[in-house]
């Protein structure tokens, strides 16, 4: 005989753990964004950290520089020219990321998503920041594996050419100006997309609401440096 709790719909169950006192069981609820100026609301966004303390930048692996040497990271602009709340918000995301397990992340994500009128179908990791180390790659791929069971695709970009991606199976990664085993996509910044686009490369329309190339495997994409 099934217990009474077995009859509780997922949406009602999710409400218990994401609102009121239950919000303490679901801290991820305040750390996920639904889309932005370019991404659709069906894409959840989570950062492993802010651009200002990006591991790739600290290791001199970031390639977001103009020919004259000026740093042109788009994520950094949000922390320096927009609301002062952006940086502390991303620091909270970093704090959460460093202690959460893949299983806990996905459990909370699914509960939050169950309450949405327009559910997320994708998770974009690292609108800002990058992998802190190898354990972040492993955790992110496990999250991607678990979310795939719920028909949510997980993808990201990285400058961390020093890390090992050979065991990545589910996370769709675009290497920023580099590609190696385990990274199926290549994403390049160029000065002029007409003049500098290599043969076989697609041009980023800079509007993810009409394009999904970066979440598909086997893509080569150029974007105008901005």
Show the residue positions of the predicted features.
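Class I S-adenosyl-L-methionine
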Residues: 1-226
